[in-house]
Swiss-Prot record:
Gene Ontology molecular functions: DNA binding; excinuclease ABC activity
GO cellular component term of the entry, any: cytoplasm
PANTHER family on file: UVRABC SYSTEM PROTEIN C, UVRC/OXIDOREDUCTASE
GO biological process: nucleotide-excision repair; SOS response
Function: The UvrABC repair system catalyzes the recognition and processing of DNA lesions. UvrC both incises the 5' and 3' sides of the lesion. The N-terminal half is responsible for the 3' incision and the C-terminal half is responsible for the 5' incision.
Name this protein carries in UniProt: UvrABC system protein C
Residues in UVR domain copies: 215-250
Keyword Cytoplasm (UniProt): yes
Gene3D superfamilies xref list: 5' to 3' exonuclease, C-terminal subdomain, GIY-YIG endonuclease, UVR domain, UvrC, RNAse H endonuclease domain
Gene this protein is translated from: uvrC
Annotated keywords: Cytoplasm, DNA damage, DNA excision, DNA repair, Excision nuclease, SOS response
Length: 614
């Protein structure tokens, strides 16, 4: 490891770093950019440590994030490795361990969604979720590029093969079929209405379908339908007929690309300082869909270099799945090292291709088309957003000379003081930063006191977090005063521009008024781009707050009715809800059905029924 410590005799930072770079070897390895307090700002890998680190200081830097990084570098540490592959693996391990702020390449790095068949015997469950949790035992299918695609597949599986989707706790406590059985989306294995052998057939058919083997299912269903008819078991024959009908409908709607194979097809494009990457997911020869990413990279760098950075970030930090093939629009400069690193990390080989034919060429063309279309749309949105930030700067010229890049906005949501939630949304000139969004559950205040709620949220936020360039409050002078009070108490009042946006006359949208601490209010025209920006951010804060509030309120209301019933503790409340499958089903239960739940009995059942129906 090579580094320059705080006690270095070279006091000037620039001179110290230059001295360090001169001593770096032309060998592969990993470098860590450190801040003034020794905190890790960025981790990178290099084929040649000396050349790569020197590039940060030997050229004009166009990308604002890289400029900001270089300005904060106080020290550099390096670790030499035996190969470029080893450097890549070490880089990703360090990024996962330290989460450096300047290594955030993807704003949306949620894990992909998978359909999951549990290992529970004899009645496995069908579900979906993000990532492959180590605590879950079973088979995973996917990944699916969107929640819509995963849910659509799950609903389809339910209709066709009727596997259960309930939790194991719910399943074990059932005494009668639930609503899913009534609407023909489950065969009620919980109460023995389907044999383990018949259910196993449904499981096997589900697995075949998810693997793309629908033709085998088609043949098997025809045989079973005919056999059931010959045995005069017409109920089963009708069941298999309905499955066949749905299967044929699905086969007719399947993607054009029906060859076998699994691949991630990845295309990159850059324009106007913005880069877009499209990841097209192909499994079982079917195109499951695609997702567009806009990585925070320097667009002046070669496309292939940025694609390499994206791929390592994507496969090591976002997805849990490595297909047999990765098809790329551009050849990577370190393609062999990337391939070896992925194989080591996932424990399976992958073939990376850039020259493809026939169906694979069609997949790649589709990925390129999606990339270019998404880039064009995003660029238009970005230019509009950039124009709005410029308009805001012009409007605020008389108020501040501060550069406005990061804006944080707060809102409070409740229903007559119930389930109060505070929200914080974050925007910069690249758009919303959803990773930085936060929701705050408000406690220990008088219900309906918006001022106390805002004070609590701001105090909790800025006790730990740095201030943005602009702090936007949804509300009038009163809320602005609360924000001023909080920042004063924290000793950071002058470190940000504080604005509240209030509804104008008649509380009509478009008549908003901006309030400041040391300046007269601003009444902007309805066509003002600056006003449109602030209204958009304010509305997003409101949406984020009210969504969380409704979820909390509804959850509380569904359980609060049961909480007032004497003799009905937490365990019995949970048993009731699990037995009937939710509050709505519980409300529809008779007194006798309530008494049949273990631990309830006729006396308590009478009380529960009375409270629920008064």
């Amino acid at each position: 490891m090579v580094n320059v410590s705080e006690s270095s005799p070279i006091d000037d930072k620039k001179a110290r770093l230059k001295h360090l770079i001169q001593r770096l070897p032309n060998l592969p390895g990993v470098y860590k950019m450190l801040g003034k307090n020794g905190d890790i700002l960025y981790v990178g890998k290099a084929k040649s440590l000396k050349s790569r680190v020197n590039s940060y200081f030997a050229k004009t830097i166009d990308h604002p994030k890289t400029r900001a990084l270089v300005a904060r570098i106080h020290n550099i540490e390096t670790i030499i490795t035996r190969s470029e592959t080893e450097a890549l693996l070490l880089e990703q391990n360090l990024i996962k361990e330290y989460r450096p702020p300047y290594n955030v390449l993807l704003r949306d790095d949620k894990s992909y969604l998978y359909v999951f068949i549990s290992a529970d015997k004899p009645y496995p469950r069908l579900a979906y979720g993000r990532g492959k949790g180590n605590h879950q035992k079973g088979r995973f299918f996917g990944p699916f590029p969107s929640a819509h695609a995963a849910k659509e597949t799950l609903v389809l599986m339910q209709k066709m093969f009727q596997m259960r989707q309930c939790t194991n706790t719910f399943f074990k406590q059932r005494k009668r079929p639930c609503l899913e059985y009534q609407i023909k989306r489950c065969r009620a294995p919980c109460v023995g209405l389907v044999s383990p052998e018949e259910y196993s057939e449904d499981v096997n058919n589900t697995i075949r379908f998810l693997k793309g083997d629908s033709s085998d299912i088609h043949t098997a269903l025809i045989e079973k339908m005919e056999a059931s008819a010959e045995e005069l078991d017409f109920e089963k024959a009708v069941f298999y007929r309905d499955q066949l009908s749905m299967l044929r409908e699905v086969q007719a709607k399947q993607a054009v690309y029906t060859v076998q194979g699994e691949a991630d097809v990845i295309a990159i494009a850059s324009q106007g300082g913005m880069t877009c990457v499209n990841v097209l997911t192909v499994r079982g020869g079917r195109v499951l869909g695609g997702k567009n990413y806009f990585p925070d990279v320097d667009s002046s760098e070669p496309l292939a270099d940025n694609l390499s950075a994206f791929i390592t970030s994507f496969y090591f930090q976002v997805t849990d799945d490595l297909p047999a093939e990765i098809i790329l629009s551009d050849e990577l400069p370190d393609q062999l090292a990337v391939s070896e690193a992925l194989a080591t990390h996932f424990g399976s080989k992958v073939v990376i291709k850039t020259s493809v034919r026939e169906h694979r060429a069609e997949w790649l063309d589709l990925a390129k088309l999606n990339t270019n279309n998404a880039l064009k749309t995003k660029l238009g949105d970005y230019l509009e957003l950039h124009a709005r930030f410029g308009a805001l700067k012009d409007v605020l010229t008389e108020v501040t000379d501060r550069t406005i890049d990061r804006i944080e906005c707060f809102d409070i949501s409740h229903t007559m003081g119930e389930a109060t939630i505070g929200s914080c949304v974050v925007f910069d000139q690249g758009g919303s930063r959803r990773r930085d969004y936060r929701q705050y559950a408000i406690h220990d205040i008088v219900g309906g006191d918006d001022y106390a709620a805002m004070k609590q949220v701001l105090t909790r936020r800025y006790k730990k977090q740095p201030l943005p360039d602009l702090l936007l409050i949804d509300g009038g002078k009163g809320q602005l005063g609360i924000a001023k009070e909080v920042l004063t108490e924290l000793g950071i009042l002058g470190d940000t521009l504080l604005i509240s946006v209030a509804k104008g006359e008649g509380r009509k949208a478009g008549l908003e008024v901006l309030h400041f601490i040391d300046h007269e209010p601003l009444d902007l025209p309805m066509d003002s781009k600056a006003l449109h920006l602030l209204m958009h951010i304010r509305d997003e804060a409101h949406r984020f707050a009210i969504t969380a509030h409704r979820k909390k309120r509804d959850k509380r209301r569904s359980s609060s009715v049961l909480e007032v019933i004497p003799g009905l503790g937490e365990k019995r409340r949970r048993d009731l809800l699990n037995h009937f499958g939710g509050m709505q089903q519980l409300l529809g239960a008779s007194q006798q059905e309530l008494a049949g739940v273990q631990g309830i009995g006729p006396v308590l059942a009478k009380t529960v029924y009375k409270v629920l129906h008064e």
